[in-house]
């Protein structure tokens, strides 16, 4: 940044250390680990982080392990990224708390990409692997993304899919569930991280 005046860092921000799901492959499913992962950044603290770092950020990713939609100031955080001219702002979420209104406000305020965690493309597998998740809410969110992309065609949808023996066969169903709005598919093998 100092020499060329270019942005070069990615900032990965979890504004809250909590999750509404208990996915089988995630550390938030481990009760002991969950007890040690607590806390919420106040918006004022996020503003201080932004003042120190966002002017050098090439990308701001909100949510990188926890569930950012649990933070009451989510849209303000996204807008803060754009206020500092961060070129690319993304949100990683399970999506079950992301209403059409909240998503529309986030995109209007500068959200460039939505990364949705989905570990099954049938109700049975989705709800088994993503404990507390509702497949109907996931499908409703995908319909909302389709609507929002009509107004904001540059808005991107990424699906994060953790592959395991329970869901590998369901990858063939991705197009019937997600449709043509998918821009990026992120695949990774399951691993025990908790």
What are these regions (language model features)?
Residues 1-113, 124, 128, 132, ...:
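Conserved alpha-helical substructure of the radical SAM core
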Residues 14, 29-43, 51, 104-194:
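Radical SAM enzyme [4Fe-4S]-AdoMet core and its adjacent flexible, acidic
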């Amino acid at each position: 940044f100092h020499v060329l005046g270019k942005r070069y860092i990615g900032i990965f921000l979890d504004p809250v250390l909590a999750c509404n799901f208990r996915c089988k492959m995630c550390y938030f499913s481990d009760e002991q680990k969950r007890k040690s992962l607590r806390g919420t950044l106040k918006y004022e603290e996020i503003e201080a982080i932004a003042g120190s770092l966002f002017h050098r950020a090439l990308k701001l990713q909100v949510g990188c392990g926890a569930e950012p939609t649990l933070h009451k100031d989510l849209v303000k955080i996204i807008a803060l990224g754009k206020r500092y001219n961060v070129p690319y702002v993304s949100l990683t979420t399970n999506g079950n708390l992301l209403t059409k209104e909240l998503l529309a406000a986030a995109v209007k305020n500068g959200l460039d990409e939505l990364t949705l965690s989905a570990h099954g493309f049938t109700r049975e597998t989705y709800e088994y692997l993503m404990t507390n998740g509702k497949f109907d809410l996931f499908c409703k969110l995908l319909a909302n993304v389709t609507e929002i992309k009509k107004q904001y065609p540059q808005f991107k949808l990424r699906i994060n899919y953790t592959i395991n023996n329970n869901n590998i066969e369901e990858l063939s169903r991705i197009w019937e569930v997600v449709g043509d709005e998918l821009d990026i598919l992120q695949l990774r093998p399951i691993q025990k991280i908790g």
